[in-house]
């Protein structure tokens, strides 16, 4: 069994003609120290926001030790002063505003070589999208040191939130939820799912005559009806090429899983159980699915092959495992740890290997109610909802670095999300 543990960053980077900063990282088994400064400019408000977001992104990456250098009025870089403080990299930013557009400029300096590495501009045509300027800056700084990719930072999160009784709206947001934009409203709109990696269209369920799965192009506004079902109609997963969907439908009784081909419109039933089968996810090169079922009398995690055959119980731990996500080779599930009839219960997240014969299991959370785990598109990060002591937050787990980060949910009641 392959162990997922803490990664020794950058030690396996293969370079020819490696520069001084990367040489230090390689030889001393440490991650680089970076100072982030804002150059004095007229747009202090947005400059401060981008600076704060960039520093946070660098920390979340797990690839830097970050110092916030605040405002610098001196355009000359005092390399020796930074070197004396054991600083490896310096990032200086400034932000300019034109009408409703923002442009952020970053100058990255390698203190060990006393050289400016690059100057890059990043423009967003909506000032509310300033977080993405910071996210893109961070991705490029991360690429410079050739650390593992953090491209997931610039992906959009799509989420549904309850507004009033019987109503919910769908929003798109950055991973910190700092940027938010409503894209669907009016009625009950739930279970949003990205159509593909381009993030131009979404699937979601809308209550019409019956719950109905819709495909909504966010650019053109075009809406297409796919499938309706009396009790439940949800897109649980999308194949990598976007052609096949796993649907949770209940046309006659309780929920079963179906495979839907978006080109042929063919709908094939995968499970035929008298109870509840939901939350199916593609695994093992999309030859199998993992899903939640109550066929043992309580919710648990099972697997089955798409070409037929019986179901296999995957999780032997716990008696209430109610949600699952997978990157194909590993899965993360939600498990109820307590059974308080009248009080709050604890739900934790667990990571398991899907390799045949593996018994690897690792707890990812320790307290509170941790639910709705979702893997990032690169399979290295988990997003989830955390409720603890009357507070709620969107959580990020960097699996290889054993770190958690939280973004408070203020006046938000999230129904479901995808990223």
UniProtKB/Swiss-Prot annotation:
SUPFAM superfamilies: TolB, N-terminal domain, Tricorn protease N-terminal domain. GO terms for biological process: cell division; protein import. Keywords: Cell cycle, Cell division, Periplasm, Signal. It is found in: Periplasm. Its main location: periplasm. GO terms for cellular component: periplasmic space. Residues 1-17 form the signal peptide. Part of the Tol-Pal system, which plays a role in outer membrane invagination during cell division and is important for maintaining outer membrane integrity. The Tol-Pal system is composed of five core proteins: the inner membrane proteins TolA, TolQ and TolR, the periplasmic protein TolB and the outer membrane protein Pal. They form a network linking the inner and outer membranes and the peptidoglycan layer. Belongs to the TolB family. This is Tol-Pal system protein TolB.
């Amino acid at each position: 069994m392959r162990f997922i543990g803490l990664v020794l960053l950058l030690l396996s980077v293969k370079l020819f003609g490696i520069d001084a900063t990367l040489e230090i990282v390689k030889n001393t088994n440490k991650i680089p120290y970076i100072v982030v400064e804002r150059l004095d400019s007229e747009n202090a408000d947005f400059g401060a926001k981008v600076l704060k977001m960039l520093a946070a992104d660098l920390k979340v990456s797990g690839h830097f030790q970050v110092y916030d250098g605040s405002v610098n009025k001196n355009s000359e870089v005092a390399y020796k002063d930074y070197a004396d403080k054991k600083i490896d990299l310096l990032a200086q930013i400034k932000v300019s505003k034109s009408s409703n557009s923002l442009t952020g400029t970053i100058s990255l300096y390698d203190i060990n070589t006393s050289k400016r590495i690059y100057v890059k501009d990043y423009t967003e045509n909506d000032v509310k999208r300033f977080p993405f300027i910071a996210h893109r800056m961070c991705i490029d700084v991360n690429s410079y040191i050739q650390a593992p990719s953090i491209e997931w930072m610039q992906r959009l999160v799509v989420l549904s939130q309850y507004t009033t009784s019987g109503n919910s709206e769908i929003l798109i947001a950055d991973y910190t939820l700092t940027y938010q934009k409503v894209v669907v409203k009016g009625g009950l709109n739930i279970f949003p799912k990205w159509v593909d990696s381009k993030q131009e269209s979404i699937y979601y369920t809308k209550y019409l005559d019956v719950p109905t799965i819709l495909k909504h192009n966010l650019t053109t506004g075009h809406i297409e009806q796919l499938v309706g079902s009396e009790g439940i109609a949800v897109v649980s997963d999308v194949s990598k090429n976007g052609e096949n969907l796993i649907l949770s439908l209940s046309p006659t009784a309780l929920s079963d899983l179906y495979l839907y081909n978006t080109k042929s419109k063919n709908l094939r039933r995968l499970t035929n159980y008298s109870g509840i089968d939901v939350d199916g996810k593609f695994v093992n090169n999309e030859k199998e699915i993992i899903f939640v079922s109550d066929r043992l009398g309580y919710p648990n995690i099972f697997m089955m092959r798409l070409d037929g055959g019986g179901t296999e119980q995957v999780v032997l731990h716990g008696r209430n495992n109610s949600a699952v996500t997978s990157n194909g080779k590993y899965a993360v599930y939600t498990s109820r740890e307590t059974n308080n009839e009248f009080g709050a219960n604890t739900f934790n997240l667990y990571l398991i290997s899907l390799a045949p014969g593996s018994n690897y299991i690792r707890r990812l959370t320790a307290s509170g109610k941790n639910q709705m785990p979702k893997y990032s598109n690169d399979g290295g990060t988990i997003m989830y909802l955390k409720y603890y002591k009357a507070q709620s937050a969107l959580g990020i787990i960097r699996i290889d670095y054993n770190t958690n980060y939280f973004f408070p949910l203020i006046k938000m009641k999230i129904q479901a999300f995808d990223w």
